[in-house]
């Protein structure tokens, strides 16, 4: 029997990228932005006067290397690999300086994944998997398999896709019906 495949986004799905951006922007611009303030918006729309600072933070060498892992992501992804072919599909083209950092981060925090399954791309319509778990509605719109939205503060008002709110939800979605 052929195993089904799952492509998983990195930023805001495996890694808490936005939390790190908010911390850096708050520190540098002496702001007090909280995650909850985004309420369905992207950070650049909440503080448009600091859009250049957001870009600067993202382009800093090492930024993507030190992100926190989302709760339960490691354990659930490891379990998924027992039943599915798992790929990491990260849209790295917007921040080309992120390639090495993202690669090293994945090797450190997900050492059980085959690096040949890391896909650095722009648009995820090139990814031919059965499922895509992503926080970005634009990527989910163009994906040809089954799109699954991972909840993030910027997408909470989007109801066009099946949704998972956490890695425990991902585990339930994919593993609860697997024959033991």
From Swiss-Prot:
Pfam families documented for this protein: NT5C
Residues annotated for Mg(2+) binding in this entry:
9, 11, 135
Task performed by this protein: Dephosphorylates the 5' and 2'(3')-phosphates of deoxyribonucleotides.
The answer, when asked if Metal-binding is one of the entry's keywords, is: yes
Q: Which UniProt keywords apply?
A: Hydrolase, Magnesium, Metal-binding
PANTHER family given in the database record: 5'(3')-DEOXYRIBONUCLEOTIDASE (PTHR16504:SF4)
Q: From which residue to which does any coiled coil extend?
A: none
Task: Report the EC number(s), separated by commas if there are several.
Answer: 3.1.3.-
EC class of the enzyme, as a word: hydrolase
GO-annotated molecular function:
5'-nucleotidase activity; metal ion binding
The source's superkingdom equals Bacteria
Q: Which family does it belong to?
A: Belongs to the 5'(3')-deoxyribonucleotidase family.
Q: Which Gene Ontology biological process is one annotated for this entry?
A: pyrimidine deoxyribonucleotide catabolic process
Which InterPro entries does the UniProt record give?
A: 5'(3')-deoxyribonucleotidase (IPR010708), HAD-like_sf (IPR036412), HAD_sf (IPR023214)
List, from the UniProt record, the residues annotated as the active site of this protein: 9, 11
**What cofactor does its activity depend on?**
Mg(2+)
Q: What name does this protein carry?
A: Putative 5'(3')-deoxyribonucleotidase
